[in-house]
């Protein structure tokens, strides 16, 4: 069905995405690349614009202040460029940050990652975008691993992992799932259900 929650109240992939894109304070990215300019595989060569344009929307009644961090990375998550923007968004408003051009970098082997932090340094939102269709991106094996520690599932990655899926049982609800990782470690809270066994996979495994 098209529902994001099944008959028993269990979360499907869409519901985890909905939790993110309906966040009261949201960071999102409008990327320019192949899919926004020309999807014809037989097209004559042309100058492809590759850019990222971050937006922060604030649907709360309070002013939001924080920092938007960004990085341009390779498939192994190593950094090519990085930086940040100070962000102030009035209540019930949205702010566009400066557009960034990456036309001089590779189309199939670079990706753009972004993260929004509040004044206390807490992660409010994050994500990543590609400049080509995912099936054409040169993903590297992120060497994902996951294990249970107390009330958390700890996920580790050695490279870029897109749409990381934690499988921990049909009745388990987590604080996050189907997320992107720039390598490193991420702790995901077990909100409901009992975890007997845990496995993890990403877009890399769709082959």
Predicted regions and their residues:
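Generic C-terminus detector
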Residues: 195-207
């Amino acid at each position: 069905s098209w529902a994001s929650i099944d008959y028993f109240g269990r979360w499907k992939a869409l519901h985890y995405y909905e939790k993110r894109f309906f966040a009261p304070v949201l960071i999102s990215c409008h990327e320019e690349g192949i899919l926004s300019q020309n999807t014809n595989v037989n097209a004559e060569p042309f100058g492809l614009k590759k850019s990222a344009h971050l937006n922060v929307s604030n649907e709360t009644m309070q002013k939001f202040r924080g920092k938007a961090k960004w990085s341009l990375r390779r498939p192994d998550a190593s950094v090519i460029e990085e930086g940040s923007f100070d962000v102030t968004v009035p209540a019930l408003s949205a702010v566009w940050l400066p557009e960034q051009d990456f036309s001089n970098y590779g189309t199939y082997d670079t990706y753009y990652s972004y993260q929004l932090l509040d004044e206390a340094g807490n992660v409010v939102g994050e994500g990543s975008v590609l400049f080509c269709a995912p099936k054409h991106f040169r993903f590297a094996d992120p060497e994902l691993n996951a294990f249970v520690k107390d009330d958390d599932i700890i996920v580790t990655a050695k490279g870029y992992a897109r749409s990381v899926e934690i499988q921990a049982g049909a009745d388990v609800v987590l604080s996050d799932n189907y997320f992107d990782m720039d390598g490193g470690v991420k702790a995901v809270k077990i909100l409901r259900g009992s975890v007997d066994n845990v496995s993890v996979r990403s877009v890399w495994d769709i082959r």
